Amino acid sequence: GVGRQYATFVGEELPNYIKKTFNLCQNNEDTYIGGLSMGGFGALHTGLLYAQTFSKIAALSSALIVHNIAHMQPNTSDLIADYDYYSLTFGDLEKVEKSDNNPEVLLKKLKSEGKIIPQIYMACGTEDFLLKENREFKTFLDMEKIKAEYVEGHGTHDWEYWNRHLEKFIKWMLQIS
């Protein structure tokens, strides 16, 4: 992305540091990434951008807003942020849909290059204001024949919903029944 290089830090520098410092296994099989809301988007983006680092991605109530903010105009805002924030975070909003800031672009790239796609777990509340975007992304995954664990349930964009799903996605990541 643009702006500060958080994806590089989270996707490359931090995992390498942790593996070396704590003498952990160097393969990606036991390296996961997860997040909630904008962090859910970040987990998908970083997990796909650094697919060689992560084997699994967990994304709860993800802010999959790339299509919403594309073509946004200066001095405008939505429920989350304003044009300036999005421009700093994603770069040229006229080009964001076709950029590596779009998880759909990253998935298509991994597929076309024959690379392994990390396993994906998603959950979103049925009353969450980002439900439509999460459903659309799941539809994209289905159309691309990319398997993902997708869960919906009663709840909004809050910790009450996420707390109910944290244990589920941790068990999924660790493959515990």
Q: Which role does the model predict for each range below?
A:
Residues 1-177:
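Non-catalytic cap/lid and distal C-terminal segments of serine-dependent acyl enzymes
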